[in-house]
Amino acid sequence: MDSFAEQLLKKKLGGKEGVIIALIWLGVIVLSLLVLLFFPPISILLVLLCWGAWWLTQTQFIEYEYSVLNGDLDIDKIIGKRKRKRVVQVRASKIDEFLPVTDKLRPEDFQRVLVAAWSKDTATFYVTYNSKKNGRTLVLMEPNARVFKELYNGQPRIKQLALEKACREAGVALPTEQSTEG
C-alpha cells in the first residue's frame, strides 16, 4: 500500500522582499508621474505600469510544497500562486542523509543549496543527495509531523537509527503525529 503526505509551506516575507515590493511601487509612482507630465495622451501606459508592478510584486510570494510518496521526496516551488516549478525530485534510495540542522552543517561543502523553508534559520531538517545535473545537493526544510514520518519510514533502518541518534545529540525532538500540522 502506498503511503503519502504533503505539506504547503508559505514563505514569510522578510525585509528584503518588503524593500523589493516598496521599490517596485515607488518606481511605478515615479514612472506614472513622468508619463502624465510628458505623455498625457498615452495614459494606457499607467494601466500597464500598474499591472506590471502587481505582477512583479506577486513574484515575491513564494510557497513550497513537500510531497512524500513511499519515501520519495518531491518539492515544488510555487511563485505567486500561479507558477509551479519542481525543484527537488529524489527517490528515497538516493537520499544520503536526512538529519536535523546543527551547527556542524557546512553548506559550502555542497554544489547546490536549496532553502525550501521560511529561511535558513528556521529550517529544522536537511536532506542531502547526489544529482547528475547539480552535483552534491543540500535541501534545508521544515517538515511537519506527517511529512517527517513518511520521509523517516522511507529510509533504511540504518539511516533511521542515525537520524534518531543525531536528534538526541542535537536535543531535537522527533516530530510525532500529535505535533501541530504546519
Language model feature labels by segment:
Residues 101-123:
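Cytosolic, membrane-proximal regulatory domains of ion/volume homeostasis and mechanosensation machinery
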Residues 1-28:
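N-terminal membrane-targeting/pre-transmembrane regions
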Residues 47-72:
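Transmembrane-cytosolic junction motif
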Residues 33-44:
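Transmembrane helix interruption/hinge and helix-loop junction motifs
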Residues 116-169:
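A membrane-cytosol interface segment of integral membrane proteins
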Residues 87-106:
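Structured surface patches comprising rigid loops and adjacent beta-strands/short helices at the edges
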Residues 69-87:
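Membrane-cytosol interface motif
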Residues 1-4, 26-27, 45, 166-182:
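Eukaryotic intrinsically disordered, low-complexity regulatory linkers and tails enriched in Ser/Thr/Pro
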